[in-house]
Amino acid sequence: MELSIHNWMRSETLETTIRRIAALGYTKLEIAGSPEQYNTKEVRHLLQQYNVSCWGSVTLMLGERNLLAKDEAQRARSVQYVKDVVRMVKELDGHMVSVVPGTVGKIVPEARPEEEWQWAVDSLKEVYTYAEESGILLGIEPINRFETYFINRGDQALALAEAVGPKCGVCLDSFHMNMEEADIYDAIRRAKGRLVGFHVADNNRMAPGMGHLDWGKIVGTLREIGYDDVLSVEFCSPLDRTPANPYPNSLDENPKDLSPEQRKFLEDHGSTAVTEEFYAMLTRKSYETLSVLL
């Protein structure tokens, strides 16, 4: 197995991120699903310069992005967005795209269950066909009930993947699993054969090793089902503005170049902009916890 990490949490240049993770020993990057922000030729050059490769990307389902929207035109725009993410990953020689079907933060349905299910299937089939032609895997990611009402558990993601296509996969996330699964390890086992990605954060969404999850057992279960690809670090530190914050210098009160989209994404995840020192600590802690298990 290898270690990858996201870059959507901190507002900094991509080179700053890549330089940091390369120095620590990471070999992969899971680039933010913002294809409009990146010149893929320049990104490829940076990755090659620091001997890091693109693992894939994760969709940022903000605003009107919703593959199961009631409005057909909205669904079409959302499909095109995910295709654009797939294209970016293809141009970066990546491997997979993790897809959250619905808008993050939307917890109220707008149609009957069977309607939304069919809209999601139809939208994902279109993306799946495009991804397969591009040689990129799709992984449907379940996230917790406080961020979406649609797909929360591995079994739900598996059912959707099976409805979409034979090579459509799932991407599990330890933080969400800790909230939604009766048994994390059984959920991993049931994903055997369809697991194309695995996001890692501890139960409190801090870096692995800063909570109570059993990382040795998680990695062992992944090996048990034959998953030997990439663990993608995706911590997202919780917002703490109280005197009880154990990391008083963690909040970046004046972040530079934080886009409205990135700010909204962090807020939807109960987080905020963090300082370079704190972010580097989380990145380092993740590597130290996981690298010895691989």
What are these regions (language model features)?
Residues 9-11, 35, 60-63, 103-105, ...:
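Active-site-proximal loop/turn and secondary-structure-junction residues that shape catalytic pockets
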Residues 47-70, 74-75:
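Short hydrophobic interaction/assembly module
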Residues 48-49, 72-169, 252, 257-268, ...:
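Active-site acidic/histidine proton-transfer and metal-coordination neighborhood
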Residues 28-50, 58, 101-112:
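Glycine-rich, proline-tolerant flexible connector loops at the mouths of alpha/beta enzymes
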Residues 16-23, 37-58, 87-94, 125-134, ...:
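Acidic (Asp/Glu)-rich catalytic clusters
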Residues 1-2, 11-22, 151, 158-168, ...:
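Histidine-acidic metal/acid-base catalytic patches
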Residues 1-13, 65-79, 109-117, 149, ...:
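Active-site mouth loops of central-metabolism enzymes
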Residues 1-7, 29-31, 54-59, 97-99, ...:
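Hydrophobic faces of well-ordered beta-strands that scaffold small-molecule active sites
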